[in-house]
C-alpha cells in the first residue's frame, strides 16, 4: 500500500510513543499481528469500518481483538482512533510507514535478496557486510528464492535494485546484440 500524509502522520506518532520505551520492534510485531488478523478475517475489517455498527458493538469488538492479540494499550488506542475517525483504510500504509521510520530510529536498512537457490550463511554474511559498508547501517536481509533468475543475486535496498543475476545479464546481452 502506498504511503500517504495521513498514514505517515500516524506512523510517526506511533514511533514517537514506542521509541522512548524501547518498544519499536514489539510494536511492529503487534502491528503485523493486526494486519494478519485483517487479512485472515476480512469481515473483521469490514465490521470495524462499518459506519452503521453500534458504538458499543465496536467497542466490544476492539476489546476482543486487543485481548486476543494481547495488544499494548497504545495499539488498542490506535485501533480505536482509526476506527472512530474512519481511517482504517490507511492501516496497511501506516504499518509500512512505521517499519520505515522505526528502521531509521534503529539504524537499520532492509534489503530484499533474491537468488535462484538458497544462499548459505557465509554468502548472507558477505552480502550483509557489504550493504552495511555501503549504507552505514546494519543490514536486515529478507531472503527469497526465485529459480527463474538462473543464478546470481538481485538486491532491492533503499529504493535501488542491484541486479547481478544471470537472467538480467542475458537480457542486457540480447539487447546489445539486437541494437
Curated annotation (Swiss-Prot):
GO terms for cellular component: plasma membrane; proton-transporting ATP synthase complex. Pfam families: OSCP. InterPro entries: ATP_synth_OSCP/delta_N_sf, ATPase_OSCP/dsu. Keywords: ATP synthesis, Cell inner membrane, Cell membrane, CF(1), Hydrogen ion transport, Ion transport, Membrane, Transport. One of its GO terms (molecular function) is proton-transporting ATP synthase activity, rotational mechanism. It is found in: Cell inner membrane. It is a peripheral membrane protein. It comes from the Bacteria. Belongs to the ATPase delta chain family. F-type ATPases have 2 components, F(1) - the catalytic core - and F(0) - the membrane proton channel. F(1) has five subunits: alpha(3), beta(3), gamma(1), delta(1), epsilon(1). F(0) has three main subunits: a(1), b(2) and c(10-14). The alpha and beta chains form an alternating ring which encloses part of the gamma chain. F(1) is attached to F(0) by a central stalk formed by the gamma and epsilon chains, while a peripheral stalk is formed by the delta and b chains. This is ATP synthase subunit delta 2. The gene is atpH2.
Amino acid at each position: 500500500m502506498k504511503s500517504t500524509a495521513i498514514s505517515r502522520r500516524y506512523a510517526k506518532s506511533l514511533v514517537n510513543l514506542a521509541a522512548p520505551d524501547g518498544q519499536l520492534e514489539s510494536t511492529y510485531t503487534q502491528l503485523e499481528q493486526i494486519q494478519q488478523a485483517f487479512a485472515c478475517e476480512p469481515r473483521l475489517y469490514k465490521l470495524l469500518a462499518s459506519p452503521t455498527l453500534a458504538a458499543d458493538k465496536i467497542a466490544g469488538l476492539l476489546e476482543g481483538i486487543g485481548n486476543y492479540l494481547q495488544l499494548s494499550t497504545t495499539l488498542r488506542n490506535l485501533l480505536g482512533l482509526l476506527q472512530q475517525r474512519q481511517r482504517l483504510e490507511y492501516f496497511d500504509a501506516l504499518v509500512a510507514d512505521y517499519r520505515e521510520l522505526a528502521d531509521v530510529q534503529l539504524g537499520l536498512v532492509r534489503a530484499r535478496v533474491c537468488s535462484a537457490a538458497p544462499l548459505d550463511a557465509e554468502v548472507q554474511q558477505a552480502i550483509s557486510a557489504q550493504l552495511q559498508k555501503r549504507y552505514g547501517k546494519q543490514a536486515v536481509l529478507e531472503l527469497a528464492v526465485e529459480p527463474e533468475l538462473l543464478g546470481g543475486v538481485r538486491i532491492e535496498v533503499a529504493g535501488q535494485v542491484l541486479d547481478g543475476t544471470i537472467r538480467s545479464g542475458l537480457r542486457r546481452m540480447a539487447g546489445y546484440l539486437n541494437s
